[in-house]
Amino acid sequence: MIYLDNAATTLRKPPQVEQAVLDAMRTAGNPGRGAHEPTLHASRLVYAARCAMAKLLHAPDPSCIAFAANATEALNIALGGLFALGDHIITTVCEHNSVLRPLYRLREQGLQFSFAGVDERGRLQYDDWDKLVQPNTKALVVTGASNVTGNGTDLAKAAVFAHRHGLLLIVDAAQTAGSQPIDVQALGIDVLCFTGHKALLGPQGTGLSLIHISEPTRH
């Protein structure tokens, strides 16, 4: 079989990943919940994973890393926890349901959002974004690349726009983490969410949030 669906999930994991899963099932206890060796071993594994992810993403500190079950959970937590009644968010028509469904749910609770559009080839129209900014706009939420068209977002342009307007920059990197380099400090990304089972070749049930809000934002 020729497998061409790696953007959905990588089917055949490297032997090292398979072995790591087996080792975790056989030797790892509950991290942070005891002082016996299996628990300490699990805590060391978790910290090592945080350090590895921080290095990969050029995060300032491993403490910026929080694990989740997948990108959907990570995005739900971020979107549900950062905004208040009456806040406004700018997002795009390219987003995955892991962004869209939480936003529609939050709209029922008073959140407002606007969509940035695309041209006839599905490419984002960056020059139109300034028209979407409102006095209560708090964040720009963008995908690194569309899961439908494969078109990528110019994160450098997105970052310049967000910083110019004092907005948080939240990036769904499910389609790009592991396949494209990401430097959260150079770009000024405040929140980055992704899954481990795609280009990172990890197992199902792995996800991550990187949270590093360094610039003052609108109040």
What is each stretch, according to the model?
Residues 215-219:
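Short "domain-exit" segments at the C-terminal end of structured domains
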